[in-house]
Amino acid sequence: MPYRVILTADAAQDFRALDHSVKEQVARQLRKLETSPQLGEHLGRKGELDLTGYHKLYAAKRAIRIVYRILEVEVVVEVIAIGKREDLAVYREAARRIMRPE
């Protein structure tokens, strides 16, 4: 059964902000998650950031990171953040979004 890939509102905004060619590469990676959600690497602690339970997937020659989690009960891959790794920026943003009250 294929997974449904959903982007949080913030991740959708990240996606819209990408250049066209990068957007195509990210979209290609997101489509792969539909059939292979375990494709990305497990994240744990990144410095002071605890991203245990989340995964990362590379795009655009490893310049872009996609941070996501797998929701097995719903058969969903939820994308939390998309962005550059520079100074752990995408991981900091993902952690901030995870910790933010709904």
What is each of the regions a protein language model found here?
Residues M1-R31:
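Arg/Lys-rich, positively charged N-terminal/basic patches that mediate binding to nucleic acids
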Residues R31-A59:
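A short, surface-exposed loop/turn module that caps and links secondary-structure elements
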Residues D19-V22, L30, E34-P37, K61, ...:
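Generic secondary-structure microfeatures
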Residues P2-Q13, T35-L43, R100-E102:
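Charged, low-complexity, helix/coiled-coil-prone segments
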Residues P2-R4, A17, Y58-R65, R69-E102:
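Enriched for short, Lys/Arg-rich terminal
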